[in-house]
Swiss-Prot record:
It comes from the Bacteria. The keyword Protease does not apply. Succinyl-CoA synthetase functions in the citric acid cycle (TCA), coupling the hydrolysis of succinyl-CoA to the synthesis of either ATP or GTP and thus represents the only step of substrate-level phosphorylation in the TCA. The beta subunit provides nucleotide specificity of the enzyme and binds the substrate succinate, while the binding sites for coenzyme A and phosphate are found in the alpha subunit. Disulfide bonds: none annotated. The keyword Metal-binding applies. The gene is sucC. Belongs to the succinate/malate CoA ligase beta subunit family. Its EC number is 6.2.1.5. This is Succinate--CoA ligase [ADP-forming] subunit beta. Its cofactor is Mg(2+). Substrate binds at N264, G321, I322, V323. Signal peptide: none annotated.
Amino acid sequence: MNLHEYQAKSLFAEYGLPVSEGFACDTAQEAVEAAGRIGGNLWVVKCQVHAGGRGKAGGVKVTGDKEEIRAFAEYWLGKNLVTYQTDEKGQPVAKILVESCTDIANELYLGAVVDRATRRVVFMASTEGGVEIEKVAEETPELIHKAIIDPLTGPQPFQARDLGFKLGLNPTQMKQFTKIFMGLATMFVDHDFALLEINPLVITTEGNLHCLDGKIGIDGNALFRQPKIKAMHDPSQDDAREAHAAMFELNYVALDGNVGCMVNGAGLAMGTMDIVNLHGGKPANFLDVGGGATKERVAEAFKIILSDSNVKAVLVNIFGGIVRCDMIAEGIIGAVKEVGVKVPVVVRLEGTNAELGREVLAKSGLDIIAANSLTDAAELVVKAAEGK
């Protein structure tokens, strides 16, 4: 689960981090009034969506004219913002953040993730703020400095000072950076973050550190113990198909290919996508129906997959472990009849009663192609998607 920038900054403020005074607004009139409450003669207005690249897409504006704030809000509220991180439809804009403008002398980067290699929370800092950290990591990895947080001792001030020296901070900024670092590290654990970024963390013209942006990703598995954070969820930012799939305990992620995939087990699903790609196809989705591939869940899975107009063929790859393959085959047949599938369906069954399952499919009279192996299934579904 992701948070909006205004929500992230609200948490930053609770932990004593320096953020701009700002208000999240639902209407153009609220945005104009917010500028008046903030005061000054220069403001920043930002579309609130769960995606980066807002500035290049026109979703951020610096202005000293309240009527321009009104026009910006009237234009964007209710529309979708398309950036390089969204699909072609973009993300809906329901709120506009109005903030005081900050005079910037320099831009830094500060972020943290859960690193699986070290099994620790790892902080990353760089002098290359304001740009994509992935690009920095690829082109100039030596400019990224790290601090690994020991879960036994927690964050330590010396780690902040070490990063601060590498960023070239002066003594006053070092104290500010240490406070920011300690606050973020505590916040990360308190609220079960999976990702945290301040990009950029700026040095103002007065020489002070300031959190100019905020990006937070929450570990979805921990939401049961984070009621306050869970209440911040904005369902409008979720993919409609992914949200619908979650209601039926289906793990679905939309992609941009034309081969629909329905698999039981996340590992097998990723392997299936890889082999489809290997044989020249492009997966249209990741979909894990889980261990209980019942007729009802398979039917919903088909509906979700086929709601994507790009899907030209569907590959069903099921390993029958807990559930027998003949029962799964009957569920697939029932689902195909119920949904009225109009595209080719390739089914690969393996495991308990796999041969019996293939016989059930063959006798169904439906246009279902039974594959003998995963390679065979991938080749068949790619050809079917190409109309061959």
